[in-house]
């Protein structure tokens, strides 16, 4: 299928693989929470969407209604490189047509790759009449559970989750990094400073004054990369535990309180306690609860979770979590969304939202105007 616009600009929807090309450099890794609510957006929580930034690459996971506005209110209109859909329920998908069209109206030229379960192609094709003509290339890639999508120094792995429709979770898994270079040992082995040092750090042997020098002679132990896991909508399942084992951050569905466990099971969602139990079994460093309904008080949600797994947070829209390399510290909140510049000045809060605004968001940073 090809949609064409006027003039020279056109789009081809292709079905091959498209890999981003990034320069090799130390990579920051962060998650911006654009939508943390349930199926119905509220004044404080939008529908599902997460923006993962790693180095120079931007990966969007799900694109609920209003995602582009959430971007513009916090980060600006981010030119994402790839979009990953967990499934095609409306609250995870309805923001896509508008985002694609806005990119066109702002004269985007760089290609965009969209990944998702089977049915992605048909769904995007059916939106052609709504979106109209757009002038950049879009690659549509339908994936299966267990696929690994290469990124620089990492891969995004899909895994099956248990929801009411075909659904995936995603794990961003970095490869181990080389150990630290020991220049003193290299000099002692007769390696010249300069290009030979760089060659060794790339993992290639060089000739020293005393004979061949292997990188293992001058490099420390390999350093682990980071793992970030996003479940999308799911009941608790073994596949999530395995994908998240030892992860820096697990972002897990927490749609229901414990008293509604049967409803969670019937609809393919998790209770707060079930999400916490998955995190505990997987031994993750930090659990972030999302898909939280506005009918629950966030304080109650966190109390239930922390009874099972203490390092749990309930991010609000616009919160940003930074994931440093393991040797540099733990995942941490670096920006809190409960800030006046990101709050609509006029909406009337429901009783649940008013309670949330008064009692904080569980991240240790009170909303504006509240006591410490």
Task: Set out the residue ranges of the language-model regions.
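Metal-dependent catalytic neighborhoods of phosphoester/phosphodiester hydrolases
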Residues: 95-103, 127, 297-306
């Amino acid at each position: 299928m090809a949609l064409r616009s006027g003039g020279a600009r056109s789009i081809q929807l292709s079905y091959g693989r498209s890999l981003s090309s990034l320069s090799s450099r130390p990579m920051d890794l962060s998650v911006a929470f654009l939508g943390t609510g349930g199926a119905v957006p509220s004044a404080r929580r939008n529908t599902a969407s997460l923006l993962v930034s790693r180095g120079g690459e931007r990966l969007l996971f799900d694109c609920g209604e209003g995602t582009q506005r959430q971007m513009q209110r916090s980060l600006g209109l981010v030119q994402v490189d790839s979009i990953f859909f967990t499934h095609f329920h409306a609250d995870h998908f309805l923001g896509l047509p508008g985002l694609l069209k806005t990119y066109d109206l702002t004269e985007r030229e760089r290609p965009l790759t969209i990944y998702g379960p089977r049915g992605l192609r048909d769904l995007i094709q059916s939106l052609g009449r709504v979106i109209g003509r757009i002038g950049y290339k879009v690659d549509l890639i339908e994936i299966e559970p267990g696929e690994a999508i290469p990124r620089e120094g990492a891969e995004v792995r899909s895994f099956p989750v248990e929801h009411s429709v075909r659904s995936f979770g995603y794990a961003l898994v970095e490869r181990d990094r080389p150990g630290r270079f020991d220049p003193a040992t290299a000099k002692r082995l007769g390696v010249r400073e300069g290009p030979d040092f760089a060659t060794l750090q790339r993992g290639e042997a060089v000739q020293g004054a005393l004979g061949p020098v292997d990188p293992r002679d001058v490099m420390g132990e390999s350093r682990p990369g980071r793992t970030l896991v996003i479940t999308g909508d799911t009941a608790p399942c073994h596949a999530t535990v395995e994908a998240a084992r030892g992860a820096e951050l697990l972002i897990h569905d927490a749609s229901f309180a414990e008293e509604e466990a049967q409803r969670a099971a019937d609809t393919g969602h998790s209770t707060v306690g079930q999400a916490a139990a998955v995190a505990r079994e997987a031994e993750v460093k930090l659990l972030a609860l999302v898909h939280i309904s506005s009918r629950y008080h966030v304080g109650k949600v966190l109390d239930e979770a922390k009874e099972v797994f203490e390092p749990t947070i309930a991010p609000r829209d616009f919160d940003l979590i930074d994931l440093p390399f393991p040797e540099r510290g733990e995942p941490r909140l670096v920006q809190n969304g409960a800030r006046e510049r990101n709050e609509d000045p006029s909406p009337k809060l429901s009783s649940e939202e008013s309670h949330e605004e008064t009692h904080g968001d569980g991240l240790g940073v009170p909303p504006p105007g509240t006591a410490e």
